[in-house]
Amino acid sequence: MAPLTPQLLLQRGRPKTDKLGKIQSLNLSGLQLLSEHLDPNLLGRLKKLRELDLSNNLLETLPANLGLSHLRILRCTNNQLGDVTALHQFPELEELNLEGNPFLTVSDNLKVSFLLPKLRKVNGKDTASTCSQVENLDRELMDRVTAHWQKFIATVSPEEETDKVRADFMRSAVRDVCYGPESLIEFTQWRVRMIAEELVASGGAQVQDAKVPVEHPQAAGASKFRAREVASKRPGKDPVTLPPSKRVRALPPAQAEGSPMGADGGQAALHLEPLHFLQCHSRNNSPKDLETQLWACAFEPAREEGHSRATSQTVATCGGEAVCVIDCQTGLVLHKYKVPGEEFFSVAWTALTVVTQAGHKKRWNMLAAAGLRGMVRLLHVRAGFCCSVIRAHKKAIATLCFSPSHETHLFTASYDKRIILWDIGVPNQDYKFQASQLLTLNCGSVPLRLCPVATCPDDFLLAGCEGGCYCWDVRLDQPQKQRVCEVNFIFSEDSKVSGQRVDGLAFVNEDVVASKGSGQGTIYLWSWSQTWAGRGRQSVLPVVILVRLQWSPTNLAYFSLSTCPGKNLVLCGDEEGSVWIYDVEHLLKEPPQATTLQPPTQILKWPQPTALGQPVTKTMINTVVANAAFTYLTALTDSNIVSIWRRC
């Protein structure tokens, strides 16, 4: 492609004119333009240009000083942009579209909101929520950099050279001032460097935050398959908050009667405090929505093995027509993906190794989300777009999970009473996936929970179903591509009990499985190896129960349990808004009599946050998940509230 010419600009510009200075709208899309083709001397003659379309080109960056100071609308979709800082040259910009630039991340979205104070829309979406996030994040970073400066300058000797002091402070600030999620570290380090430079230039005077837009209002943020009767809520006007007395101090750990606690051989309490209550799945962004049921959440895997911040504090949540990705420390909603008319039931993470067009290997954390429509949506969260949609089932998908041993292998379980194993592959040059179907597992009832066997995930898959707990052979070296279950696990010799729903299923460690149903008031801990060793040729197999844990006797279903394997913890919510926590390490070392119900180590009571000016006095906790280090715990309710707790 030859460089741009005045004739080409006149041909593609509007209104039609013979003078470059009169063009107000210019379409340069689809011309295979490279960054060096954007000549500032030529484009700078477009003195009245208000709208520019650079979509579907090969731009890696935008040249500085293009001279388009009056530009209001800029479209740069489907390019190769890797940096957005050059956009600051367009101070009047109101609308920006950067979709289809795979190297841009959530950090770049925040940079854009910071650099362009008049921006109203990015990628077709209102920027109010992002601007509010930038405000809060920037305010905290300013406070931390200022505190770091004061601490640093107190240790400096008067004899030290000024230039060396400044350089040392800059390095230490970028290295030591940390806040927010790892996914935003590029933005936070960028802002820390800017704030530090301003501090040094001002001799330590308080940095002003006039650059941050402060007047944008913050955006507020029932399935036929799973709907339960909605718990009572009370309307009002304000966002979800805790009463002041519960926000300023750690909530004392609630202890179930008879819990093993204290120094007399019992277990010490796990101290957790309520940190954030978020209403980010609202339909139509309505703050009055206390009805949307939230179903599943999963913590993002660490971005880099051996990284100093190896434990993720980023959690994906789903419910209603939205999937949200939230930073637990700050409570910021980093990304929100909405599909009108969808009901999301499940999310799952995987980490893929992707080769870029330049031949570089990158590690991508991909999020799969699925629900009512039977489609799996693969989201590249850091870049903020949906890569592909897999039309997996004709009926709703109840749950999904990735294989722990094959990063591209995905199990989907549907209300069509089938489980399908997919190989999603890796994205091509257009960042699209080509999924292939590997296995179909037939179920006698609807599968609700999936759990690859910890010691042999390539061989066997467990599933909790409406009709019980089942196991399938999933070895890919076997010829059959359609398979029936190998074993039906039962928890009692009573056939009535054996056919009951299993809606909670997870491995506590490599051998011990936790499972539960409704109406039993019990969570079972049972041994996979001991149970499987007694199989023989049986198709119905009693499990070897190690421990029975006391839980709510409710007849309501779909309260999912989870585990924190490295900590030997089992977690489950209930119909009263409580979180039941079981530290089972001592129980597994010295199992009690199997018939004895063991009480929870701790119960976190619902703290009754305020929504719309009135307390939410009652809710149900559908799902509870903690990160690997058990520093954060996320509980999802049936009243459109994501509650985040922090271990203290």
UniProtKB/Swiss-Prot annotation:
- Record's protein name: Leucine-rich repeat and WD repeat-containing protein 1
Gene Ontology cellular-component terms listed: centrosome; chromosome, telomeric region; cytoplasm; kinetochore; nuclear origin of replication recognition complex; nucleolus; nucleoplasm; nucleus
Q: Report the PTM annotation.
A: Ubiquitinated; undergoes 'Lys-48'-linked polyubiquitination leading to proteasomal degradation. Ubiquitination occurs within the WD repeats at the end of the G1 phase. Ubiquitination may be catalyzed by the CUL4-DDB1 E3 ubiquitin-protein ligase complex and other E3 ligases.
Q: What is known of its domains?
A: The entire WD repeat region is required for the interaction with ORC, CDT1 and GMNN, as well as for association with chromatin and for binding to histone H3 and H4 trimethylation marks H3K9me3 and H4K20me3. Centrosomal localization requires additional conformation.
Question: Gene3D superfamilies recorded for this chain?
Answer: Ribonuclease Inhibitor, YVTN repeat-like/Quinoprotein amine dehydrogenase
Subunit text: Integral component of the ORC complex. Directly interacts with CDT1, GMNN and ORC2. Interacts with ORC2 only when non-ubiquitinated; this interaction prevents LRWD1 ubiquitination and degradation. Some of these interactions are regulated in a cell-cycle dependent manner. Interaction with ORC1 occurs predominantly during G1. Association with phosphorylated ORC1 during mitosis is not efficient. Interaction with CDT1 occurs during G1 phase, as well as during mitosis with phosphorylated CDT1. Interaction with GMNN occurs from G1/S to mitosis.
Listed under GO biological process in this entry are: chromatin organization; DNA replication; establishment of protein localization to chromatin
**What family name appears in the similarity comment?**
Belongs to the LRWD1 family.
